[in-house]
Amino acid sequence: MAFLGLFSLLVLQSMATGATFPEEAIADLSVNMYNRLRATGEDENILFSPLSIALAMGMMELGAQGSTQKEIRHSMGYDSLKNGEEFSFLKEFSNMVTAKESQYVMKIANSLFVQNGFHVNEEFLQMMKKYFNAAVNHVDFSQNVAVANYINKWVENNTNNLVKDLVSPRDFDAATYLALINAVYFKGNWKSQFRPENTRTFSFTKDDESEVQIPMMYQQGEFYYGEFSDGSNEAGGIYQVLEIPYEGDEISMMLVLSRQEVPLATLEPLVKAQLVEEWANSVKKQKVEVYLPRFTVEQEIDLKDVLKALGITEIFIKDANLTGLSDNKEIFLSKAIHKSFLEVNEEGSEAAAVSGMIAISRMAVLYPQVIVDHPFFFLIRNRRTGTILFMGRVMHPETMNTSGHDFEEL
């Protein structure tokens, strides 16, 4: 099973106090954000949800007017749509990925936290409910400890109590009027699960050539696989793409792995929305030997600089036009925090203790081997629509608790 939770915080303060939309727009947003994040964090893990960010920015657009709204629409790739048409698309897409009949679970929960006594336009509240199913809560931000506890409890309740301490009291003060919280929860079983008894301790070699010991899962099975050229002569100029579906085949994790001799940084500049589509269209179902780390990645991102780099700047200054949200013309967005957590394992959040190990060989085989023992790029996507739900990379896999497992080193 793989579990992924994604959580976003947007805080508003007062100074005086191909594919078609939305898939195409989200694909472009995904790649642009990824490139910005890798430029500012050379050797760090990356994890974010472009879907979550698109929904959060849709909420901000609902409250924006004039040049502020125009800037958001342009940066999000909505220029080809009629004004406001994007909200219907976002609502339909959100409803599709959270459908109860799906074989995976994906919940998107939104809430607007409002300072007691502060006026928010009724039409804005109605539109928030209509398009984003967003609730509204009144709080006293001057009581920052109580507010932080309240919001953290809300996040826990909407993520099966798996994520705690999203915000801290220092995120709020008496000048804070509004906080917009967006939480996404995803959980899915692999279509072909990894057997826990096949997991072994394995060396993961980082780009600086240091090594860390991690639990390495293993299975042979039929997966979507392809080899692609990176245009260089290093290590044959070939990299691997493996797509592992979740139950139901609608959602999958796509792994992109350079040859071990080639740092991931050499491959990353190639990543474009069109290339992601090419990978999806070119991989073929075949038998593959897969060695995949059992790992967790957790990351908190300050979205303010990232969004500014993408062209969204006005919402962060005192001249922001958010009069669709409130008649208070002094209001602007002061903080944007995006926190994500990813856990990938054999079959669940707690793998069963086992004994009786099965030997695993790295000798010659008749079909491809994908040995994920060095940094890799990944995304989680809807295979039917092509929509990217999550994107990231693993440079430093954090070892999960292996207590109770009799691992044997390969």
Swiss-Prot record:
Swiss-Prot/TrEMBL GO biological process terms: central nervous system development; peripheral nervous system development; positive regulation of neuron projection development
Signal peptide residue numbers: 1-16
SMART domains recorded: SERPIN
Keywords assigned: Cytoplasmic vesicle, Disease variant, Glycoprotein, Neurodegeneration, Protease inhibitor, Proteoglycan, Secreted, Serine protease inhibitor, Signal
Origin: domain of life: Eukaryota
Annotated effect of mutating V163I: Increases protein stability and decreases tendency to form polymers. No effect on inhibitory activity
Record carries keyword Glycoprotein: yes
Site (Reactive bond): R362, M363
Glycan attachment residues as annotated in the record: N157, N321, N401, S403
InterPro entries assigned: Serpin_CS, Serpin_dom, Serpin_fam, Serpin_sf, Serpin_sf_1, Serpin_sf_2
Illness: Encephalopathy, familial, with neuroserpin inclusion bodies: A neurodegenerative disease clinically characterized by dementia. Additional features include intellectual decline, psychic seizures, progressive myoclonic epilepsy, and cerebral atrophy. Histologically, it is characterized by the presence of eosinophilic inclusion bodies (called Collins bodies) throughout the deeper layers of the cerebral cortex, leading to neuronal death.
Family stated for the protein in its record: Belongs to the serpin family.
Described purpose of this protein according to its UniProt entry: Serine protease inhibitor that inhibits plasminogen activators and plasmin but not thrombin. May be involved in the formation or reorganization of synaptic connections as well as for synaptic plasticity in the adult nervous system. May protect neurons from cell damage by tissue-type plasminogen activator.
Name used for this protein in its record: Neuroserpin
Organism this protein belongs to: Homo sapiens (Human)
Higher taxonomy: Eukaryota, Metazoa, Chordata, Craniata, Vertebrata
Gene coding for it: SERPINI1
